[in-house]
Amino acid sequence: MEPYSCDTFVALPPATVGNRVIFGKNSDRLFDEVQEVIYCPAAVHNDLEKRLKCTYIEVDQVPETYAVVLSRPAWLWGAEMGANEHGVCIGNEAVWGREDISKEEALLGMDLVRLGLERADTAEKALDVIVDLLEKYGQGGNCAEGKEFSYYNSFLIADRNEAWILETSGKYWAAERVQGVRNISNQLSITTKIDREHPDMRNYAKQRGWWDGKEEFDFTAAYSYIDTAAMMTSPSRYCQGYKLLDKHRGNITFETMMEILRDRPSGINMKGEFLTTASMVSVLPQDPSLPCIHLFTATPHPERSVFKPFIFVPHISPLLDTKSPTFEPERPVAKKPYVKPDRRHPLYQKHQEALEMISNSKEKGKTILDKMRKLEKAVSEEIESILQSGHLDEEKTVNLFPQYVKDEIKIYQSNISS
């Protein structure tokens, strides 16, 4: 399978408008994989002898886990991207390098995303959680449902105050504290600016003959085949993504991030066997009195999707219209030939019908797209109102994301049936 993956972005003040950290990710997965958006409340775990079942393996549970909102492939436990109640956001990317990829079942990168969000109230603490779990349990296993697809992982971790890039190769890793703007794609990208690292990372590279111990250590050059001297002038999605961020430096808003995620010429908005199956943008105000706001599509094709807002408040209403059906627990690739169950959630089903209408009828397609953009404009106006005023109607906010999902479904239903 061709090694295509995702793109994750972050921009920090002064690159942004309004003293806000802006996070964004496109999840590029197999074209027919359904991604759901779910909410998991905070929890206290008194029985710590009871282990936590992740996608393939069990890990030790912790006394307390935080509330999280996750965008995830519906067949697994972890998540492609998400946020927690403390404003921590994480997205991961598939990466490949010199180290052979382990197919032995361990923690998936997507499991590590969820575990980091559930267990950490700052970005750097999430980094600590992930590298500790990586050391204890390792990473590996099949990352697709019904097909062989394995990789190592890089992570972009952000909160209200800072952001980190964490890149891995097996159990070895390097981390970079972000300044200004930064993005990751499906390649290693940390070079000589290394702020934290695995204690044996350099020795291992030297033992393998990847570094002579004399030249300045370059993580990407040592652990991958990338020519880092040409990395920022190549036609790669990584390079194109950075150019899009840099183009808007000083004026980046959440709308800017949505525009970047919708960019087709760069390949960031992916089409083909690997498709942008879901997208996320988060607004993390540095003022702690203001809420963090997280926007999810829960549908593929961001240029034909609506970003809908989620805000953490007590007593969140269930996200029923973006929750996939639940099936009997089974190993994703245990049965051969493997037949995928129908994991489409209600929004996904109506969105697929609308996409067909957009493709087949120019007039109806324009009507649907116009209404979608109008709905998203209302989203943007509501977000700005909340961030400018600081006022949050909690009774309304418990239904904020579910209501916008219902409004989106109504657009599709009214035009499909007419």
UniProtKB/Swiss-Prot annotation:
Does the UniProt entry include the keyword tRNA processing? no
Family of the protein in this entry: Belongs to the peptidase C69 family. Secernin subfamily.
| Coiled-coil intervals | none
Residue ranges annotated as propeptide are 1-5
Which Pfam families does the annotation name?
Peptidase_C69 (PF03577)
Q: What is this protein called?
A: Secernin-3
Q: What happens when the gene is disrupted?
A: C57BL/6NJ males exhibit impaired thermal nociceptive sensitivity in a TLR4-dependent inflammatory pain model. No effect is seen in C57BL/6NJ females which is consistent with sex-dependent differences in response to TLR4 activation reported in this strain.
Catalytic center residues:
6
This molecule's function is given as: Plays a role in thermal nociception.
Gene name linked to the record: Scrn3
Which GO terms fall under molecular function for this chain's record? cysteine-type exopeptidase activity; dipeptidase activity
| Keyword Kinase found | no
Q: Which Gene3D superfamilies match?
A: Penicillin V Acylase, Chain A
Top-level taxonomic group: Eukaryota
Q: Could you tell me the Gene Ontology terms of the biological process aspect for this record?
A: detection of temperature stimulus involved in sensory perception of pain; proteolysis
User: Where on the chain is Glyoxylic acid (Cys) found, per UniProt?
Assistant: 6
Write down which residues bear the modification named Pyruvic acid (Cys).
Answer: 6
- Keywords of this entry: Pyruvate
Which species does the entry assign this protein to?
Mus musculus
